[in-house]
Amino acid sequence: MSLPFHRLQRWNGQFYEVISLQDLGFTLNLGHNGDVCPLSTGDDKHSDQITVVDSAGIFVHSVRWCRCDGDEDKHLQLLRHRLFPSTISRPQTAFSFNVLDEFLIDSLECKTSASSFYSKLRRLTDNAFPDTLPVCFRILL
């Protein structure tokens, strides 16, 4: 999938409701150009759930790692897909390169703090209930 960080809405008969790609069963496959790793069984055993912060908002995705011999560490697989992991050992949060570039420009030109920038992303994701989203701005620093 080429656009994993788009916000979706689905008509439920009365109104459009927000729905995630994860709700639709989407899993972000790392390695093999987005295809499932041949050594993966396709079950949840080889996947993790991570929070991805993008300039379009905050998303939770299932991620299936490449398991081939000589496969890269998880943090390197994320970097190859232009996602900067929050930690090297067990990444549970990642920031897209786009959001990092946007934060850099906002902080240099507008003097935006990490807290304010992250609050903006929370509002973009859910303007009605931004406090229901995870707080990751300290990781952004």
Where are the regions a protein language model picked out?
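Hydrophobic core positions in small helical hairpin nucleic-acid-binding modules
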Residues: 1-141
